[in-house]
């Protein structure tokens, strides 16, 4: 009943086409002071229109009454104004005591009423088979830019889809469609795109986890930490006073990362790097051993201009940067798993440090364990992810030349999100095996 009219032949959005009139009835409220009571009672008796997107209180259909503030309540279509058998007992009681009258009413709906899903479903034919993709509903949002990844069958409708999406999402000013896979066309993880709606303005600003990020969406990706992008993982961690070394090969991402470190005032805790991920894995382990950093943490004190502090504040604790990393995050699912060989012999070739001395950096000689590796990757979809978990562990084993199974201690494979009808993103977390970390190379 509330669906828009079908428009299968439409290729260019015509907003004026989506109009619909639903014949129904309305309760004319004779006294304005009774509107609230009548609405409550008729809602309880299920006489009002059962649609949360329609305001049931409307100006009276009689123009003279409407000018004087007259209102009516829209009733469900099953209520017929001249057939009392369709009225509920409550509606009859209110009519008999003179509180209201039941009149015919035309409910007019237009483009603004219908949702994105309703409009696109009215235009685009449904999938012919279960194997076909459903009409695209989701999109990635970065600031004012909505990012689509349309399948070929929807290309004839791409501009129409973009126009409707922007109409129904006020924060969206620009809609783009990705033309290739991130990370497959170039080393900087950028992608080709086409603008479907709005200006070609990719300079975005967004806020997440109490942090502000500014970057060019076309030139920099917002992912993290060996592939750190503009810092969406590194900077929130820095806000929590975690020492983070964040690397990205893309110079545009690196520039935005530096800017965002400054904007969010986390320079004491986040160290940016601009190099290849494989080189960063090895070199950062060496550099961190040589690096010394301690950050005093001061208690929060309220200052008054009229009564400035008389003594220099004293830190209540000092945070010291560890000599080894506790976690490595590799969030580039298209290729991150291929960087795992860089961890082979990570601590076997430290200048000035023998393998025996390197082993003493970790348990049982210290409280520090070997680092956890968190690598994102793609796989297929299933209801229980059992086959996918085994497949991912097998690939990790192949990359590290060390057997890894779902039963291995500290191994955890969890699904992050669906990215396509038959494709799912996973994050594989595992502790770097000792035989890998100290293998002679």
Curated annotation (Swiss-Prot):
The keyword Mitochondrion applies. Residues 1-9 form a transit peptide. S-adenosyl-L-methionine binds at residues 221, 248-249, 276-277, 331. GO terms for cellular component: cytoplasm; mitochondrial matrix; nucleus. GO terms for molecular function: tRNA (guanine(37)-N1)-methyltransferase activity; tRNA methyltransferase activity. It catalyses: guanosine(37) in tRNA + S-adenosyl-L-methionine = N(1)-methylguanosine(37) in tRNA + S-adenosyl-L-homocysteine + H(+). InterPro entries: MeTrfase_TRM5/TYW2, SAM-dependent_MTases_sf, TRM5-TYW2-like_MTfase, TRM5/TYW2-like_N, tRNA_Gua_MeTrfase_euk. Its EC number is 2.1.1.228. The keyword Transmembrane helix does not apply. Keywords: Cytoplasm, Methyltransferase, Mitochondrion, Nucleus, S-adenosyl-L-methionine, Transferase, Transit peptide, tRNA processing. Pfam families: TRM5-TYW2_MTfase, TYW2_N_2. It is an enzyme of class 2 (transferase). Its main location: mitochondrion. Gene3D superfamilies: Met-10+ protein-like domains, Vaccinia Virus protein VP39. It is found in: Mitochondrion matrix; Nucleus; Cytoplasm. GO terms for biological process: mitochondrial tRNA methylation; tRNA N1-guanine methylation. HAMAP family: TRM5 (MF_03152). PANTHER family: TRNA (GUANINE(37)-N1)-METHYLTRANSFERASE, TRNA METHYLTRANSFERASE. Specifically methylates the N1 position of guanosine-37 in various cytoplasmic and mitochondrial tRNAs. Methylation is not dependent on the nature of the nucleoside 5' of the target nucleoside. This is the first step in the biosynthesis of wybutosine (yW), a modified base adjacent to the anticodon of tRNAs and required for accurate decoding. Belongs to the class I-like SAM-binding methyltransferase superfamily. TRM5/TYW2 family. Monomer. This is tRNA (guanine(37)-N(1))-methyltransferase. The lineage of its organism: Eukaryota, Fungi, Dikarya, Ascomycota, Pezizomycotina. The gene is TRM5.
